[in-house]
């Protein structure tokens, strides 16, 4: 899930996951507002921002997932947010960011309500190459480090209610990791 232009399709096309057969995605599914990406260990559904923004269409998609796989409709949700919404000429105002965040939160809540499961939600910040110095920073990393997550993974149980202090913990952990990596370069 993401906002228009977040780069979900680019992420799915260039993620390095093994594709068992030619043509990882089903372009025919685009007409339905989502594209299915087939990998050797799973399927990813790239939901268009039009469907995410339209509550009725999103509700219908969630219901289809629930009816197709009633015991486990999804394993997780991936929320893709571009850096361009946070920095630079195209950055959003605080009010607009809050509105976008609230809208995406409501969709994730609706999804979990319809499928009757609390699923892990991963947040990917895309378009890092738009950050000044990010490309040079990544070029200096070893191949092994480039394959690792540059971010924070919640140490809390999936069912634990969200706590606002997690954002501070995440920012501190990411900052600490970045400082350590810069010293190694």
What are these regions (language model features)?
Residues 1-185:
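Basic, amphipathic N-terminal segments
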